[in-house]
């Protein structure tokens, strides 16, 4: 994909834990941590009401359950929902895997989705925070590399790979 992109390999993300720069949103029984330096363009957090509003309304069982679901399936891990009673984050059990994210709504190619705690290391040996969910920049334009910040939408990044429905078996 980098043959088709104006790729700048400079890593720009600070090696700061995700939660350190997160904004906190309180709801009854839960607290949402949101680090806006990371991509939100997958829109899983907006599937059935926004996760921010669902957190605020989480005294309603359906809103609570949707807030849990929407936050856990944020590919970048930008959103983390804290259960105040259990004193732990809701986090899906993901096996180590890689995936490519495509954005048909914005008609662009998105980041590399890294799941299941696969370590991310820089070329000089820098070890980034190991997380269950993270998205890595493929377009070369993120201001938070190696992480995706959603700039692929602005630059209309195209990886020119066939969609899965077009792949030959």
Q: What kind of feature is each model-predicted range?
A:
Residues 12, 143-169:
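Short histidine
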Residues 79, 112-114, 134-137, 147-148:
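Short, structured motif recognition centered on aromatic/hydrophobic residues
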Residues 101-126:
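Intrinsic, low-complexity N-terminal interaction/targeting segments
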Residues 37-39, 136-142:
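Short Cys/His-rich zinc-binding micro-motifs
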Residues 3-18, 62, 85-98, 159-164:
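Polybasic, low-complexity binding patches
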Residues 57-68, 131:
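Short linker/helix segments within small regulatory modules
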Residues 1-44, 48, 95, 107-110:
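Ferredoxin-type iron-sulfur electron-transfer modules and their immediate structural context
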Residues 1-8, 40-58, 69-86, 145-156:
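Iron-sulfur cluster-binding cysteine motifs and their immediate structural context
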